[in-house]
Amino acid sequence: MTESTASVLYEVRGAVALVTLNRPQALNSFTREMHHALWAAFDQAEGNPAVRALVLTGAGRGFCAGLDLSELDFTPGPGLLERADPGPVINDAFNPTTRRLQSLRMPVICAVNGVAAGAGASVAMACDIAIAAPTASFVQAFSKIGLIPDAGGSWLLVERLGL
């Protein structure tokens, strides 16, 4: 996971694990493979007793644009609703990621360097602390596309606001 073509980069700097979402050409939108690579980075950090904190950030101009829609199949025809349903990837990938972020044995700091959209915003909110650059923005536009917030977004937003 250290080569520059990996979807998630992992490095240790002193007592800090730096985890970088590394698909800048797609605004670091998540694929299933990327979730698995992120979980492996979490395992590395937790398995290293020298690591006392984790920083999560994105490469390029965005933090994370949420789900990479190429993970879904929008080909017209029978079964379209099942193939285009984001539910399975939310349940199998995003939900475990946000739960895992909240259960790591160390503080997790999200360095939001650009747009954090949809489930990407939920991932940022699942961290213990989010630090937003002047270029950062948080977008929850689910209602505009007929969805409800996923990856714990509804609960995490209320929690972070202290309501």
Kindly give the residue locations of the regions a language model identified.
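Hydrophobic/aromatic residues within transmembrane alpha-helices
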Residues: 19, 56, 68, 123-124
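Charged catalytic carboxylate motif
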Residues: 33, 37, 93, 100
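Crotonase-fold acyl-CoA enzyme core
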Residues: 99-163
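Glycine- (often His-adjacent) and acidic-residue-rich active-site loop
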Residues: 58-99, 116, 146
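Conserved CoA-thioester-binding segment of acyl-CoA-metabolizing enzymes
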Residues: 1-59, 75
